[in-house]
Amino acid sequence: GSSSWRRSFEPPPRVARGSIDWDSLKPALGDAQPFAFSDRSPEALPARRFPHLAQTDCRETATTPEIHALIRDNLGRAPMYSGQIDAECGPRYCPSIEDKIVRFADRDAHHVFLEPESLFTDEIYLNGVSTSLPADVQLPLVRGLRGLEHAVIQKFGYAVEYDMVWPHQIDATAETKRVPRLFLAGQINGTSGYEE
């Protein structure tokens, strides 16, 4: 067997686009020209290799000191802070809003990016507000954001706890070193699944 490590993941709430004052928010534009992942690609290649697609309309807002106070007052109700979830850590680059308020207590605001969940739904992903706080805290948290004063939450944030196999037990092909022909991908590798 492999030794594992407990991790957690807390996706943010999803909000109905029609309930957002979209025009009051700052546009958050993507890159006009896509870039290749490899630094070996000549600059002319990306334009030929990647199709030019219409930009998805995203927006930006920010948390406020009032939202931070609401979160601090309810930290004990968040599973990661109450001890209900005992994962050793959450995602390194996408900390929960609770973690941001605790770790960066000197900041008055944190960016929140409003991103369409897909081209075929009106669900908006609130990137930057990952949380597992109860619904009765999430609603005023979300409605405290500028432009979301009348937001309708379609899916509340929540917490997931899972096992992760230590990276030194997996080789570069994603095959486990202890069990031949067993390949792992996704959260069990401690990633979000981008290696597939």
Please identify what each model-predicted range represents.
Residues 113, 125-189:
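A glycine-rich dinucleotide-binding beta-alpha-beta segment and adjacent secondary-structure elements
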